[in-house]
Amino acid sequence: MIKAENQKKRKPFTAQDTIPYKEIYKDGICRTDDNYYSKMVQFYDINYQLAQNDDKAAIFENYCEFLNSFDSSVEVQITFLNQQVNFDEYAKNIDIPEQDDCFNDIRKEYSDMLKMQLSKGNNGLVKTKYITFSIKADNLRNAKSRLERIEASVLNNFKVMGAMAEPLNGVERLKILHDVMNMDTKESFHFHYGMVAKTGLQTKDFIAPTGFDFRNDSYFRMGQTFGCVSYLQITSPELTDKLLADLLDLEENLIINMHLRPIDPKAAIKSLKSTLSNIQKMKIEEQKKAVRSGYDMDIIPTDISTYGEDVEGLLNEIQSRNEKLFELTFLLMNTADNKRKLDNIVYQTAGIAQKYNCNIRRLQYQQEQGLVASLPLGMNQTGIQRIMTTTSTAIFVPFTTQELFQGGEALYYGLNALSNNLIMVDRKRLKTPNGLILGTPGSGKSFATKREILNVFLITDDDIILCDPEGEYFPLVNALNGEVIKISAKSNDYINPMEVNLDVIYHPEKYRINGDVEDIDTIIADKAEFITSFCEVIMKKPQNAELNGDEVSMIDLCVKDIYKKYLYNDPKPENMPTLQDFYERLNFYAPDKPAAQNIANSLQLYVTGSQNVFNHRSNVDTQNRVVCFDIRELGTTLRKAGMLIVQHMVWTRVSQNRSRRKSTRYYVDEFHLLLNQPQTANYSIEMWKRFRKWGGIITGISQNVTDFLGSLAVESIVGNSDFILMLNQHSGDQKILAEKLNISKHQISFVNNSNAGEGLLFYGNVIIPFADRYPQDTRTYALMSTKPDEIQT
């Protein structure tokens, strides 16, 4: 930042003259004066306000170290830009385009719902944060090398604090300046550096407004926009980190800038000692006056005594603690469409400051200098500074509430309970997109699951598979023209557990992906592993004992016999092996192999007995985009085997889709039931670990958190889940969840006696409280509701 006394600036005659930089280069370096250069970094919010006290203290300490990392040759500007954007343009981010199918009426209704939710929050107000650092250098080359070193340090410091940050290039810096100075126009910024050479114009010509008017002493006009720059007068004896947060919560156009100039420690100590010496002289003079006047010489004016104590304390902090001194200029720029609205916004802003015993003062006859200091260029010509220590400066922690609003195939998860902003995230962007949806009965768990399924169906081409133990998903599945497969002993829907993907045989080249090869050998190996797990379930050994070596070997031998004969002899779907083939092969070896006889005896019930539902070739459309396995009527005898078979069918589908570069989403309700048995638990763990690599996204849904957390598999499941939607929880489960997921008491309060559709969203390292109040007067609500009087059949 360039101080006013160093400026010999001619009076500006054009709007471009008011914008005080010489040049902004392609790499983002800005030359503000002959010897001053700056760079700019955008950083993103973290959940400081929601963090545990220990985490808050760590962030604060790291931020203090960050401020102390700047020496007196680097001047810093921290910018908070809250800017209203055109709602219609912003709404395009969530618009769901029509497609050539029969679901456009649902798309329109869902899209309208999103726009309605968008209007509830302040998502039309885009909040961004930047840091600009400036240095003095003889030339661009010297400036560039040093600015890049500072930039690397800045990025690393933000990483330590857990905040994402990225440097801005020249076009990005110009766009920010354009948007700040052209709030009255809906025109987007279109610029590339080739336009400078083609048009003969300068970069300022592409960002300048139609004009500036600084004739009034307390406000200005920028195009058709009215603006006012004020400064924060810090009069409170003790500051709080909530002051800045409350100012940034103001749902109006607002630009806050903190200009920081570190003071050299030696110079600061020398200055303070000099000041202390002057105070001592003043004390001596006062004591002499007291003696001459005949009263006690120890009685001196309170202000001198207090001033001396303050200076001594400040000197002690610098000498004995890791404190620096900074010259701080805290500026606020409000803008509005008209003067009356501007005055109201300034009044609102002042009210927030007064709540914390501080004042907002308009810059009188300095509005132009205030505007320049409000642009992220690193220039401060106001001449208004306040000396602050590192700790007192760091109380303006630049973090408040993290938002999650992504574009592309992002899905809706409600509104941020702290800011009321729309939450839109894409699980595919996570390292491990597997997830959990946890909640007590009535918490909105099933509704949240169905809402995600519907959202996935409407905006992606992902395949969707559901395991439905309660038979509650069929209204939604039917509405999406999906396939509901009822699995029970009396059902006429059949799925063949011996079925394999013949496409591997017909088109082997499709299954060579990233060094992985799927061929006949891998098909047989995978099927042998599955049949082994299946036999472990049906043989019901005491204390869930595993199969012995002879039994495992016999299964492997029989499976190889069956599939080598089938796959190497022009395989056809109508000749697909069934459990009957496996049973017959076991009986072939049974006379000489007791292990084969044992397995065959256990298998007989499922082949020729009353539970032979799985001894048929498939007669349902397992290739439908939406498939729901309804296992509600699956009896106790078949339930474990049935759930294992469903898992295997899902894995086969994931394998097929991988070759098509297509994602598969698998939703498992009552997920804790799978973890009760070693076979299904092990299979689940394997899926959780391998799904991502194969293009699968698995979601476990559970209302019985106690059983889920008590499973030995929970560590592997949670460790491979970067997405958790946590709704209301029983008090006993809250403590366990807080320990497992390392969340604070304040965070856990959002799932304590919370209403339906409210809770915590875990997305990677981000934790956000959410609330979803889905409009009930819609067709989609009726499809997703699980309330008895609202269920649509």
Language model features: what each stretch is:
Residues 1-401:
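Extended, folded cores of ATP/NTP-driven motor/assembly subunits in large transport
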Residues 437:
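Hydrophobic anchor at the beta1->P-loop junction of P-loop NTPases
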Residues 445:
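Conserved lysine of the Walker
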Residues 455-465, 480-482:
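Post-Walker A helix-loop "phosphate-sensing" segment adjacent to the P-loop in P-loop NTPases
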Residues 481-485, 713-726:
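A short helix-turn-beta junction within AAA+ P-loop NTPase domains corresponding to the substrate/partner-engaging
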Residues 741-793:
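Conserved P-loop NTPase
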